[in-house]
A protein has these predicted regions:
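Asparagine-centered strand-capping/turn motif at beta-strand->loop junctions
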Residues: 560-564, 605
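Short acidic, flexible loop segments centered on an aromatic residue
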Residues: 565-579
């Protein structure tokens, strides 16, 4: 039996079973389960729940099926449920077990994403999202009574088995695996229930959950370290939450996967790739002192040209037909103060034009405090303007809840004129999809403002890394690098203090990096396509947040984008949780296709309680797997 001191079980919990379930079923009689070994079972549909059965009791790993399904195994009691991590696909039925007083145990680190207080705080801070350090697949509402107390290496017994929790961060920060082996037989099978630490040889499930920030390998590195640590446990069976059971070469499967993950992590940096792999270090001919590189706008202005200045993220360009100025990417109060100081020191005129290169707050939120900004024209590429004028429309990082009004939204390739300059706007996705470049001639030099694409900052530059949540992919970087190569400006006006002279050879290497990084990312994806697997947005609900009263009708559009090179059948289920109307639809999309489904019958329940309600939009592809973290939020008002 489970050690009472460890699991804190004061009594066994009896399940209401039908009489014909009081005996163990044979393998042929099992409807929902497959027998993997003596007393070891797995559900037939993924994500999988695993069960250890000893006598009348069962110990579950993860909670993807309701309690009544366990009765089929002949167990009269579920002694406890052990969660590998907080994700809602593997913890979906945790609340159902708690309702039957079954202990649900989770890693200590899971509390912020499983317990009601932590989950409510997460959703309050995540919509809209002002940073990139987020979590994925969080339950719409927390579960009361989950014991988030499991610690690494503290073993306990259940029946004939010894169960050891093993910290396995990577897929999520709080991820654990469980090593189960016979307590009295050192030569018996060693089952490693590895959750989503591994899908299969060389493959990760939803690799975008390893994007712990928006550009580095901070999540991929512990993923690889975890895989090697698990290999050292010498398991005889690997039992993942989504992938097939592995019974041969388990340690090698884990280390092979670690190698593939290491390669993807290495390729997150163009700088590292070109220095170490190509042995050809980039040669930047910077146009301003290096003190501006990676600065936050706190350095004195540096002069890039007679009429152009930079500090941090912000450029100021003086008109050729007057004394007014164009401010590109004002960032907060510091930037606004710096612009005023520059205007005073250089005897410049008022702010006449403001534009934003991309939809990250450190490049646009200064508009709200910029002196004269309320009287200036405000331009941007239409793709960049979309999330800024309506911050509740999309799920994206680095947004600000204050909407911005635009006087001009330009399309890709469209030009505008101001102060004697012709400004041509280009869509230039890279660090984020919502990015533009602006092409113009300044003091006789052909210039290209490239936003946070292609700036230099040692190992991690604006060329890499990538983040699925940011709609950022290596293949997209490569395409945009090719666009810059074709435009061949004389000067690349990158941000974060890094304008430099254009080098065609450097951009040819960036194109090559995009191709190589894309292949490394593809290699760890179950589908073989990082544009599909590394993308939490392939199914989206718009708007991401709306406010309504009980009984009100909601607006809603589900957009599905098949970013893979194969046809995809996707079933979308809106799980209304009694707050809004449920809905289900199946869409079939050829490669590259987009479809949208307008939900005109969504209604807030008349008894919906005031507050924020998160509604999960479940997606299942032809394999039956849920790989997309889609949801929307409704703030219900009295």
């Amino acid at each position: 039996m489970l050690g009472r001191a460890v699991l804190g079980l004061s009594c066994s919990v009896t399940l209401a079973l039908l009489a014909w379930f009081t005996r163990a079923q044979t393998s042929d009689e099992l409807k929902h389960w497959t027998k993997l070994g003596t007393g070891v079972y797995r559900t037939n549909e993924n994500p999988y729940t695993y069960a250890l059965v000893s006598g009348d009791g069962a110990l579950l790993i993860d909670a993807t099926v309701p309690p009544d399904v366990v009765a089929e195994l002949g167990a009269k009691r579920v002694e406890a449920v052990l969660l590998t991590h907080h994700h809602r696909d593997t913890a979906r039925c945790a609340e159902a077990y708690r309702a039957k007083k079954v202990p649900v145990r989770a890693p200590k680190e899971s509390g912020d994403y499983l317990l009601p207080e932590g989950v409510a705080k997460f959703w309050k801070e995540s919509v809209p999202l002002r940073n990139s350090r987020t979590a994925y697949f969080v339950l719409p509402a927390g579960v009361e009574g989950v014991e988030c107390t499991l610690t690494d290496g503290k073993s306990f017994t259940f029946g004939p088995w010894s169960v050891t929790p093993v910290a396995a961060p990577g897929h999520s920060r709080d991820h654990f695996a469980y090593l189960v082996e016979p307590a009295a037989d050192a030569k018996g099978p060693r089952y490693l229930f590895c959750g989503d630490a591994l899908h299969s040889r060389g493959k990760l499930w939803t690799p975008y959950t390893t994007d712990w920030d928006h550009w580095t390998e901070v999540g991929l590195k512990p993923t690889a370290e975890t895989l090697r640590a698990l290999a050292r446990l010498n398991p005889t069976h690997l039992l993942p939450a989504h992938g097939p059971a592995v019974r041969e070469e388990c340690a090698k499967v884990l280390t092979d996967t670690a190698d593939a993950v290491d390669e993807a992590a290495f390729m997150k940096s163009y700088e590292r790739y070109t220095k170490q792999r190509l042995k050809d270090e980039p040669r930047y001919d910077f146009l301003v002192p290096r003190e501006q590189i990676a600065s936050a706008g706190d350095k004195p202005w540096s002069k890039v040209a007679d009429r152009l200045w930079i500090t941090g993220n912000t450029y100021v360009l003086q008109s050729k037909t007057g004394d007014g100025v164009f401010v590109l990417d004002p960032w907060g109060q510091r930037s606004a103060d710096q612009v005023e100081k520059l205007r005073t020191d250089e005897k410049l005129g008022p702010v006449e034009l403001v534009a934003f290169s991309h939809a990250h707050y450190d490049h646009f939120d200064g508009i709200h405090v910029l002196k004269g900004g309320d009287k200036a024209e405000v331009w941007s590429l239409d793709t960049v303007a979309a999330p800024l004028k309506d911050p509740t429309r999309y799920r994206a990082p680095f947004l600000d809840p204050r909407p911005i009004q635009f006087t001009k939204e330009l399309k890709d390739g469209e030009t505008g004129t101001w102060g004697g300059y012709t400004l041509k706007f280009h869509h230039l996705p890279g660090q984020t999809f919502f990015t533009s470049a602006i092409e113009t001639t300044i003091d006789g030099k052909r210039c290209l403002f490239t936003a946070d694409n292609f700036f230099h900052q040692d190992q991690f530059s604006g060329t890499g890394g990538w983040m699925g949540l940011n709609r950022s992919f290596p293949a997209v970087y490569g395409t945009s690098a090719k666009k810059v190569l074709d435009l061949a400006p004389e000067r690349v006006l990158a941000e974060h203090g890094g304008p430099y002279a254009f080098s065609a050879e450097d951009y040819r290497r960036r194109v090559k990096w995009g191709e190589a990084a894309g292949k490394a990312a593809d290699a760890v994806c179950v589908s073989g396509s990082h544009r599909w697997d590394w993308n939490p947005h392939r199914v989206e609900f718009e708007p991401h947040l709306q406010t309504a009263k009980p009984g009100a009708r909601l607006a809603g559009v589900i957009r599905v984008h098949n970013t893979s090179d194969k046809s995809q059948a996707v079933t979308v289920t809106l799980a209304g949780r009694g707050v809004v109307t449920d809905a289900t639809e199946t869409l079939t999309l050829p490669p590259g296709a987009r479809k949208e489904l307008t939900l005109s019958a969504l209604v807030v329940a008349t008894d919906a309680k005031p507050g924020r309600h998160v509604i999960e939009v479940r997606t299942r592809d032809a394999s039956g797997s849920e790989g997309c973290d889609c949801f929307f939020a409704v703030d219900v008002t009295p």
